[in-house]
């Protein structure tokens, strides 16, 4: 086995030169193979059963599904009106009317086609793109030898479900149908679940502990592991994974040994959501998948931004700008919305940058403007400071030398506030502008959290808001916040100083990797996505100086997915470059600009 020096590990690649002039990633690919008997043997019979089920569902005529959905919706409506007529209802619930109508409206288009479901979906341009291009579901082509379920069976199932919906709440039956469809599509394609999570992410504010989100991620991981075991997906194990697993292990230890069951549950949730890095880093294997991921985030941001703008207009007309605390839209707090919009604005700017079609550029420019307006109405003015830092980070990546160091300095520059001497801090506290911006309040929170960290240096105080509040009560009675308000400080307080070192190692590898690797692939389209993910990471690090960016579990998951996307796109860009160099058989062509090919 090859031995690597510490600087090679931190740099992210070895110094060995390949015959085509490319550098070699320090990574290992893992996939299903004949020598992995425990995986392939276990999944062999299950895979055959699932493939048979997939074949039946795919080749069942669309008319069967239309009959099932239409009969279920229409008959449910009739049965509930009968219940209203005989006096079981004062009035038919609005929820019943909506659910029944939705199923009827969905079912009617399916009644118009006799083609198998998979073929019918491929025949329509919109559904073909959504299911088979965007969500990467495997295409099933027409096969007359395959027989599905007849329409008569669909009608019978629709009647049975409608009767069941009259006995139990209809929304429960509808939810079970939706959940089964979601599970099937998830196990059919892990990309479906992975991308759909981003679309629903803004609407998970009810899931304050992140448990529901963790369940969705766990299902995606199981589907992805199944594909890896069958040899249909690849897992990339790199030095980032080592640092991530160390950090997650510290979170687990803190969750188990420090503050009981609640802390343990929170740690398990954080571990599962941290696997967003693994999913993004391994599922994204080409530019199309990278664009799908970024588009999923952008798509989900548009309705949220519109809601935030409307909410702000209503609130400002009522209380005025001076008393307006900021829009939160579907999120629980304005600063959480600001984090999400920082990511979506950056990705929409990326598409404005790389798209050549003028109409598409205008569309993404409009989305950028809408998101930017919504970001302003969060009243999180530190977010605009981070946008300036992001612009500097983007420019730094164009430097031929020293860009990694500049990225690191931009990330930690704001933390120099922690080094201000105590007497000077007192002067800063007295400044009216500083008080208005809340900086003095933040510094006081940091000082209290530092005392707590000093006494819980290695194991931390436990995971979650409850653990933090329980421990901080031993140091002050005048603390009305659920965290320290600083990203790195809060990570250290909750999971111990080793978790901070592990995260620092991950980040150091990224900026070193990005700084040295950028000139090698600087004109690759996929590399541009990686550049923007680096910009986002730097911005979130800076934004985290005065906000704990992982307080909301959706943003914690989003952070690791964006970070994983950066790793994946670097790897893909490197592979594309090496393949082009090998194709042109010109080992002297060190600059990719002379032979760059736009991969679509």
Whereabouts are the PLM-identified features?
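Hydrophobic transmembrane alpha-helices and their immediate junctions
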Residues: 405, 495-541
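Membrane-interfacial, low-structure loops and terminal tails that flank and connect transmembrane helices
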Residues: 6-59, 116-149, 233, 513-527, ...
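Aromatic-anchored transmembrane helix interface
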Residues: 214-215, 239-251, 260-283, 292-301
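Long extracytoplasmic/lumenal interhelical loops at the membrane interface
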Residues: 425, 431-447, 451, 455, ...
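Membrane-interfacial loop-to-transmembrane alpha-helix junctions, especially the N-terminal start
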Residues: 62-69, 186-197, 233-246, 292-297, ...
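Alpha-helical transmembrane segments of multi-pass inner-membrane proteins
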Residues: 38-83, 91-115, 151-168, 177-183, ...
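Hydrophobic alpha-helical transmembrane segments in multi-pass integral membrane proteins
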Residues: 95-103, 194, 200-252
